[in-house]
Amino acid sequence: MMGPMASDETRTGTRTEGRTETPTRTTRSTTPGAPAARDARVPGPAPEATGTRAWTPWRVRLLVLGIVLAAVNLRPAITSLGALLEEVRDGLGMSGSVAGLLTSVPPLCFAVFGVAAPRLARRFGPGAVVFGGMVAITAGLLIRPYAGGTAGFLAATALALMGIALSNVLMPVIVKRFFPDRVGSMTGLYSMALAFGTSIAAAATVPMTDALGGHWQPGLAVWAALGAAAALSWIPFVRARKASASAGSPAHTGSAGATESAGAGAPRADAPAEQPPLRITRSRTAWALAVFFGLQATAAYITMGWMAQIFRDAGVSAGTAGLLLAVIMVMGVPLAFVIPRVATRLPHQGPIVLVLGVCGLAGYAGLYFAPAGGAWLWALLLGVSNCAFPLALTMVGMRARTGAGVAQLSAFAQSTGYLISIPGPLLVGVLYQHSGGWGLPIALMSALMVPQIVVGVLAGRDRTVEDEAAR
């Protein structure tokens, strides 16, 4: 599957990955003193000049599988709770304000723990950090339904969200480092997997809860199985340090598992150790991307935490409300693959931002005036708007030239963005409790879409943070 994708994206590799770099698809060694490289179409591992393990075809496929499984686990902890929020509130005796605090925990954890991801990856390697993240997700999901009381529930939720935060930040970094000429395709692939995990948890949590006896505890705990499966797939990469990128990167593996060497044993141009730290806060594009990330995250976590309840309060059954939430999330499966590929072919991503924003405004307007009457249409429109997330991830990869730049930009944009998004779900809960309805919260959601469009257009301009930070 990855072979055909690579050929499509080769044209955009140089523009996307760096405007001053040479194309990565080289078939002969160009490094003085390096062994002669194999022909690009002859299967076989790259030379192990650096002492790291070669990227054999099965290892490349296992890495792709690990990325997909990790992405599937990045949202079920949140959407499964959204589907059963009313039952959890009743079971733990939560008020609307406390429930609003609960829905604000994800962005808070993402902001606090996400900033540590690049430092941990430099010390232990990204594979080890993602593996640890999957273990934390598994443990948190197993513990939280049975922790006893609101405090224990929040603490176990925070443990799972810590694992999600670390993996959130490192996914764009791993894609940029190991698949530099396939950023659009690989971003689309793991964004599809993320959307699939999000939607399946929203749709299946209520039916599985009923099948498991009608108690919300096992209905939430069952999602730990996904985390365990993902953790197993990352075990082979626990000892893969950052230097492995210079010894036969999977980015240079063809569709038949062939290895394309650009100088055996030569350091990669995007090796983090070779890049000086960026003064990322001097980049206007970095700030625009961070605010865009924060506003789309605000909309996403309000949707995941409250949308099912909005439909239920409008007279929709619990099962149907879960399906409507799933429709919103499942729209990301096809669109999360299409949007990054389209975005990498455009010099400016502003038109995509505008289309997504208009869909969001239309969906919120319908939800305000006829929440139950046009519920399925509003869900479709909000599902399209929700695809601002894969677009933001794609722009993270496009707005920096190097792997080190992507790591810093990803950590900055996500951590700052999630800090921005913290008040949103909490404010929705407070407005709902004190107004007694959903009119004011929906008006707030709609109003936030306007600045999201503005900063998204600014973030989509064709420039890099390295150039801006150097000024």
Positions of predicted regions on the chain:
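Cytoplasmic helix-loop-helix junction between adjacent transmembrane helices
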Residues: 156-194
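Juxtamembrane intracellular "pre-TM" segments in multi-pass secondary transporters
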Residues: 47-57, 239-289
